[in-house]
Structures are given as C-alpha cells and as structure tokens.
Amino acid sequence: MSLSMIELAMQILSCSQKELASKLSVSPTQITKWKKGEYMSFDMENKVRKLLDIGDLDPNVILAFGHISHAQKWQKIITQLAKSANDNGETGFKVAPLIDEADFVLSNLVDSLRMIGYKFPLSFPPELENDYDHYIDWSDSFIETIYSNEFCSLIYNIFRSFVDVYSFYVAYISELDTQLLIENSEFSSLIIDIEASLLNLAIIKADTELPELRGFQKLKREIEKDYREWLQQLKLYAFKSNIPLRAELLHLIDDEHDNLGVEAEAEYLGFNDNRLHPDIYMNELLIGMRLLHQVLPVILDKLEIKDFDIDNESLRKF
C-alpha cells in the first residue's frame, strides 16, 4: 500500500520525491523507504489521502484506471455487478464478500488482474454514465449496454465464477473447523488460506479470454498447486479427526465453476443429508477391522482354540 500511495501522490501532485517529502513533513529518505515497501502508519496514510482527496479509494485501483474520477465511476459499476452476480446466483448461498466487502474484492481483483498483465481501460465510456446508485433502478437498455461492454462482461463473468466457487467453499469447507473436538490452529489456518485465495481461483475458472495473457498460466499453476496442497492436508486432518465430508474437496480445483455451483446447491437444498464422502466409510471399515484384530485373539483364547488355520481359498469367494 505504501509504494502505490507514494506513486499515486507523485503522479497526482506532479512533484518530485523531495517536494513530496516537504509536503508530508518527512525526509526524502523516508519517501524512499515507503517506495521500497516500508509500512506507512495509519495517521500518515490518512494525511496522504486527505492531501490527494481520494477518500477511501485504494491507490492501486486509481493507478489501474488512470484517474480518480474514472476509478470512482468504475467502482460504482463494479459494486453493482458484484451485487447482481450474487442475486443471480443459483446456489442458494449468500456470497458475503460480494455484498459486504465489495471494495475489498475490487482491490484484490485489480491486484490479480494487474499481476497477470491485464490492461485496464484508462477512460470511462460515456454510455455507462448513470445517476442511479443501485442496479435495480437501471433500465433494461442500460443493463444491456453494461453487459455488452468488454470490461464489464469480464468482471461479471469472474463474479459469476466466484459465486459458484465461494458457495462450494461455504457448503463443504468453511465450518469444518467447528466440528473439531479439540481446537487445531493448523486446521483453522488451512481453511483461512483456502478462503483468502478464492477470488484467484474464480479468475482462473471464469469463462473469459484471460488465459491469453502472459501471466495467466503462471497464476493458474500457482493457485492449483496451493489448493491441491491445502485440500489434501485438510482432508487428512478431517480423516484423523473423524469429521465427515459430504463432497470430494478436490472438486474445488478439478471441476468447472458451474459444476461447483450445482454441488453447492445440492447441499443447500438438503440433498446431501444422508450422504458421506467415501473416506468416512473407509475409516469406519478400518476401525472395525482394528477392533476385530483386538477382540478375536481374546475370543479364541477364551474358547481355548489353539490351532486355527486360515482358509485362503474361502476368503476369495464372493
């Protein structure tokens, strides 16, 4: 945040590093430290925001769109696209980040798209100008104009993917740690990691042209690698803790986002009430076999059966 804040300040104020230091009453050396990523205090951040008159806008978002007014207008449109994606979702689950944390989602989205080399529109199309603050007040023709816009279509498709991915997470993963009899910080940390990267997972699953970008495949490899590792560990913890799974968690990586949405909807509607993941059945079988291994010698001894030959041929009969 400190690097982007300084970059934005020098851009908006059209000043040198030395001049900016004077305006902020700090040394030029401190500006250099911030540019290298050193933490900027909350009070200093507020001072810079007030100087630039950017309110609560993320400086990275402003830099991406090239101008404060453009960023504000796109923020308004994207916030409504997020709400629309949630409302049009068919999983039954509320996708809380799209409703309650739209600004945070926008910041993460901008960071991820910039990372893979996406070029944001540096102007705001006049046909998207609108005085209404909520998409339910938009006319049909204006909505059609929005979805025909290439950038808006991209964002909406990512959000639709996020609805399915997040719903699967809520349906099958988010509350697993509450079922632990003994608190396990590593188990809880895994679930936090899984949730934190869901937007990136949605980006690589969305039906877009982003795979053509130079950085997309790198992001895809990293995200799939991380999730495979996290989910395998999570399954192992669940198995050892006798926590039932109602779905194969690796579907989160391997399946298309539409299929994840269908699985989430099935859980929401209660279709999985009597279904358990095969790992749970296997665990029950293993426990039963171990119990027999403990009990049988005691039974044989009590019955004074000393010589017992195993009939291997009969074991192979069905």
Predicted features and spans:
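Helix-turn-helix/homeodomain-like alpha-helical modules used for DNA recognition
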Residues: 61-134
